[in-house]
Amino acid sequence: QKCSATSRVYVHQSVEEEFIGSLKKYTEGLKLGDPRERDVFLGPVIDKKAKETFTGAVELTRKDGGTVITGGRVRTDGPFSRGYYPEPTIATGLPRGHSLERRELFVPFLVAGTFKMFDEALARANDTEYGLTAGIFSEDEAEVDAFFDRIRFGVCYANRRGGATTGAWAGRQSFGGWRASGSTGKGVGGPYYLLSYLREQSQTRR
């Protein structure tokens, strides 16, 4: 339910098995529960509609030939009986351009895909009406430069271990989306954003 949380990832096919395996293991180690407890990573989603968005995404994945490699359930046992607690979920194997790659779900559901060429990954990343946050991990500085030049998102990161697409520092980074993720293209906290709170007045004498 965090606006900048990663909802899709594109992995180079040469490291697909290793990366997806590590991601699956890490995801299965995340604790779901009461968010007031310090060791809990993930709490409930906000309402029944969000829960239904999650279950709909799981069903659509399976219907369209994808695979849910971890998660996929809404917990209702014991302490999970009060509220809606979807498990952190990863889906793979969906057709390129699938709607689950392009929609904003705001639930713990990640779509993972693979690519051969950098340009392909960039095109798929941009193939959505939204444009809030994006990130890249690469040892090739030319790729990083191309990512920053061509990605159509407002808040972008490269090789950031603290969060691939999330965790802007207030007062240090502007924060705002492009396209359907924003209205002006000007980020909160940036020098241009202040102008949104000012009015212009033309004054003429004589």
Feature locations, PLM:
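Residue-level signal for inorganic ion chemistry
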Residues: H12, L23, T61, P108, ...
